[in-house]
């Protein structure tokens, strides 16, 4: 029996978010906003807290700096019951941090400082600890520079060798990001990029062709998040379907894909069938979009399940 339900390794960041952002004031001027909040975010960080909120016993695996932001990230993770024993403090590095300017339509331009995420490194002595989970997730391949040089793939192989279900999300903007991502795909059960990232990597537009590209690289299944168009699932056995998005009023899209990953992990732990997993992941993402900041709108498992069952979807 694994020690954890979910181990989430990769990109952890400190976010300061304001809403609604309308303009940059000229010179040294001031524009007043209605809300300001802080959040642990990042492809691994958002997923970690969202999963913990929904009842998974969760291990955080990443790096923060020796600064106030790092202190806050660790305390915030612990406040949700997350095990931070695999979080590293990186001397000489600042914690990866963002100022997120969220518009009224939910779009969120950001100013980001890439910090300790670039330097954290999981060596072989840590493999048994960090992969001791039913679901092992790597979030932010492409942003974890020290790990992207082959170590992510080694940890993924170790996770597969001990029987974990593996999931991967990425940060990608062009085909040049593909080599770092390609190395982990043979050990990936569920590859879950956004459609924008998948298209940037492959140059393809059709959802089926895009998914097949990654299936041919070794993944068991590809789950493409489509924003307001829902999600597309396609696996090696030929099962494929699209799930529509929920009809909601969007407040902030920060962390929506990462919350989707957490919801999908919950579905794996609960042994949901593929379509229910994707629907539950969509519900988690939708709730995330209804709050300001990553995972703010996610409450608990029962709340997400009820939302999935009762909320209308888009046509």
Regions found by a protein language model. Give the residues of each.
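Conserved phosphate-binding/catalytic region of the ribokinase-like
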Residues: 1-6, 10, 18, 32, ...
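Hydrophobic beta-strand scaffold residues
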Residues: 58, 84, 166-167
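A glycine-rich helix N-cap at a beta->alpha junction
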Residues: 76-92
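Conserved phosphate-binding/catalytic loop of the ribokinase/pfkB sugar-kinase fold
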Residues: 89-90, 100-145
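Alpha-helix C-terminal capping segments
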Residues: 48-57, 102-103, 267-271
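Glycine-rich phosphate/adenosyl-contacting loop at the front of the ribokinase-like
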Residues: 1-63, 68-79, 249-251, 315
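Conserved beta-alpha-beta core of the PfkB/ribokinase-like small-molecule kinase fold
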Residues: 135-212, 229-230
């Amino acid at each position: 029996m694994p020690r954890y339900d979910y181990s989430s390794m990769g990109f952890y960041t400190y976010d300061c978010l304001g809403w609604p952002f309308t303009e940059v004031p000229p010179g040294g001027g001031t524009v007043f906003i209605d809300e300001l909040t802080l959040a642990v975010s990042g492809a691994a960080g958002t997923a970690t807290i969202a999963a913990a909120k929904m009842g998974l016993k969760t291990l955080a695996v990443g790096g923060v700096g020796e600064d106030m932001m790092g202190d806050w990230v660790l305390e915030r993770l612990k406040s949700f019951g997350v095990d931070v024993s695999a979080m590293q403090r990186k001397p000489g590095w600042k914690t990866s941090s963002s100022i997120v300017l969220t518009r009224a339509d939910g779009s969120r331009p950001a100013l980001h400082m890439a910090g300790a995420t670039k330097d954290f490194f999981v060596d072989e002595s840590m493999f048994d600890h960090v992969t001791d989970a039913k679901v092992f997730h790597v979030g932010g391949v492409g942003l974890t520079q020290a790990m992207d040089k082959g170590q992510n793939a080694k940890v993924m192989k170790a996770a597969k060798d001990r029987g974990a279900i593996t999931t991967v999300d990425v940060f990608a903007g062009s085909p040049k990001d593909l080599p770092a991502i390609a190395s982990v795909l043979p050990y990936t059960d569920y590859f879950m990029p956004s459609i924008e990232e998948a298209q940037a990597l492959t140059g393809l537009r059709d959802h089926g062709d895009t998914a097949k590209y990654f299936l041919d690289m070794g993944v068991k299944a590809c789950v493409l998040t489509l924003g307001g168009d829902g999600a597309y699932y396609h696996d090696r056995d030929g099962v494929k379907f699209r799930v529509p998005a929920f009809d909601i009023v969007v407040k902030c899209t920060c962390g929506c894909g990462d919350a989707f990953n957490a919801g999908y992990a919950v579905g794996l732990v609960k042994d949901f069938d593929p379509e229910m997993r994707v629907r539950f992941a969509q519900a988690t993402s939708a709730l995330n979009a209804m709050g300001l900041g990553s995972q703010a709108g996610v409450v608990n498992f029962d709340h997400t399940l009820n939302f999935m069952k009762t909320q209308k979807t888009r046509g």
